Amino acid sequence: MDYKVEHIGIAVKDLATSIPLFEQLLGSPCYKTESVDSESVNTAFFLQQSTKIELLESSNPEGPIAKFIDKKGEGMHHIAFEVLDIVAEMERLKKLGFTLLNETPKKGADNKLICFVHPKETNGVLIELCQSI
């Protein structure tokens, strides 16, 4: 498959602190914030040429981002690749023996359907597949 990097996800403790920091660092404003209740996360997006940076703040102390930060600290959480047909790509990866963290695509931030590939099978990198809705 010819994947395009859609965004890079960065886990942060506090969006209120991190948004101004990244606006200064990147020289561009945050263009969108969104809460995704199904993932217990609040997000903020920045556009850098054709790639997005997504900041992820946990909205629940037991959520996956909170657990990630407790274990590894703030930092890069995942790389997301854009796919045209997420269901077909999930089937292709399952046939190749990859473990997916969800059996069906879920509604994610930024009007996307998403699925994650287990990082134990991708050299420790959490891979997200995403398809525009």
Where are these regions (language model features)?
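Long, hydrophobic N-terminal alpha-helical segment
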Residues: M1-E39, G63
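Vicinal oxygen chelate
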Residues: M1, K4-K13, A44-L47, A66-I133
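Short, structured motif recognition centered on aromatic/hydrophobic residues
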Residues: V5, F22, F46, I53-L56, ...
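Intrinsic, low-complexity N-terminal interaction/targeting segments
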Residues: V36, E54-S59, P64-K67, L100, ...
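Hydrophobic side chains in well-ordered alpha-helices
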Residues: S18-L21, E89-L93
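N-terminal strand-loop-strand beta-hairpin
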Residues: S28-Q48, K52, H118
